[in-house]
């Protein structure tokens, strides 16, 4: 049973390591008192994803999911608060947050009022969270296509790629051990996109010129 605790610990450490990548953006915003070219949407979508999986873990009684996503949601909320504080488009950003809160409220009403059966609630929430997670992992594909076109990986973060690969792999194993497809399936795309990034790093090293004269 010790190996299960080890796997759970790996999920927590690797996932929190991936979530903490936003600390570098936080330092930039605080130091320059500006959001620079930092995007707000990744913070918001990750926060929503964390809250969804937190509720799933709560319904399932899974301490690993609860811990990871509670801390993750707290970090994303911190990043969003700093972004709102230093953004010049504060009204637009706040409107996005309010719309998201409205969606969360409607989802809460649906799952608590119209889905009283705990198993149905768990299955529907698991399906929703899985689809949302898959879409997040696949969303950077357009950027990867642009990297192939420009033959430059300067905009990619190698440490974040490693963290994403380790996180996705640990959750695939965790879900497989627990026979939970809602955890296993949505993390496969994370492995695939990470392997694709590794290939791009080997094909187009960061110190390599983006274009050749030949």
From Swiss-Prot:
InterPro entries named in the record: SWEET (IPR047664), SWEET_rpt (IPR004316)
Gene Ontology MF terms in the entry = sugar transmembrane transporter activity
**Span of the signal peptide:** none
Query: Residues in domain MtN3/slv?
Result: 6-89, 124-207
Membrane topology, as annotated, equals: Multi-pass membrane protein
Gene3D superfamilies in the record: 1.20.1280.290
Entry keyword annotation includes Ribosomal protein: no
Q: Pfam families, alphabetically?
A: MtN3_slv
Q: Would the keyword Oxidoreductase be found if you checked this record's keyword annotation?
A: no
Give start-end ranges for the coiled-coil region(s).
none
Taxonomically, which superkingdom? Eukaryota
Q: What is its main location?
A: Golgi
What keywords sit in the KW lines? Answer: Cell membrane, Golgi apparatus, Membrane, Repeat, Sugar transport, Transmembrane, Transmembrane helix, Transport
Naming one, the record's GO cellular component terms include: plasma membrane
TM spans (from-to): 3-23, 38-58, 65-85, 93-113, 125-145, 157-177, 181-201
Compartment(s) of residence: Golgi apparatus membrane; Cell membrane
The family this protein is said to belong to: Belongs to the SWEET sugar transporter family.
Q: Please explain the role this protein plays, according to its UniProt record.
A: Mediates sugar transport across membranes.
Which PANTHER family does this entry report, sorted A to Z?
Answer: RAG1-ACTIVATING PROTEIN 1, SUGAR TRANSPORTER SWEET1
User: What is the official name of this protein in its record?
Assistant: Sugar transporter SWEET1
